[in-house]
Amino acid sequence: PGRAFFHSRQGGGHKEKKKKRSSIISRIILIICACVFVFAAVRLVSILLEYKKGNDIYDNIEGNVLDDTPVNITIGEDNQDVTIPFVYNHQALLDINPDGLGFLYVPSVDIRLPIAQTTDNDFYLTHTFDKTYNRNGCLFVDYRIKDGLNASHVIIYGHNMGSGAMFGTLARYKNSGFYQTEGNDVFYIYTEDVIREYKIFTVYITDPISDTFTFNFSNLSGLREYAKNVQAESLYNTGVDISNATQVVTFSTCTDDSKQRVIVSGTYVGESKLDNGTSSEASASASE
C-alpha cells in the first residue's frame, strides 16, 4: 500500500509539471502572436499614413498648378471641341521642382499628375514630385530618353499603388468594355506652351525587360514599325490607325504581383497652344 501511494504521488506531480510546461508554452505562443499582430498593425498604420501623406502632397501640388476653371479647346484628329476642367500653370510646376516636364491628364480615371525626369530611374521611385521621400513616388520619363516629352517615343513610369494613386487605376484598361466607353480612349499631356491629345491604341502585359522599352528612334519608320509591333500585342483590337504615327507615349506600371508590366500606349493626334493657361489655336496630327 505504501508503495502504491508513493507511485500515485509521483504520477500526479508529473502531470502537474506537464500542465505547467504546457501553460508556459501556450503563454509564450500567445505573446508571440500578440507581438506579431501589434507589429503588423503598426506597420499597416504606418503604410496607410504614408499613402495619405503622398496623396496630400499631390493634392497640394494640384492646387498650386491647376486652377479649377473649365476651358474649352479645339483639338484632335477632327478638331473637336473639348472641355478641360482646369487651367494649367507650367511656371507654378517648375517653381515646385525644376525637374518637371509637364502634366498628365487622363479623364477616364481622373489622373492629374506632374511628370518629371532626372538623371536616373531610381530617385522618383521613392520620392514625390516635390522630392519628399514617399512610397507613392512620382511619374517620370526614362532618363535615357532624349528630348523629354518631345521625343518620338516617351516612356512614363509610375507605381501601381493599392490605394489607386499614381498609375493604380491603369489596369482598368485591360477591360475592353472600359476602353470602348466614350471618351476613355484619350489622354492629354501639358507641356510649357501646348496641350497634346493622344489616342490609346494598345493595352497589353509584358515582361520588365522587353522590346516595349525601345526609344530614341532615328526616324519615323522605326517608330511606326515599333507601334505596329506593340499594337499586335494588344489584349483587344482598338481599331486605331497608327500607320502615320509621329509620336507614341507609353505608360508602364507593375502588375499586382510586380512580376510583369501593364502597358498603355497612345499615339499623338493633335495639340492646342496655350496662352496664359488658356487654349488658342489647334493643330491636327502631322501625317505623311
State the predicted function of each range:
Residues 6, 20, 281-285:
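Intrinsically disordered, low-complexity segments
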Residues 17-34:
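N-terminal Sec-pathway targeting helices
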Residues 37-288:
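Solvent-exposed, non-transmembrane regions of membrane-associated and secreted proteins
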Residues 1-15:
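N-terminal targeting leaders characterized by basic, low-complexity, disordered sequences
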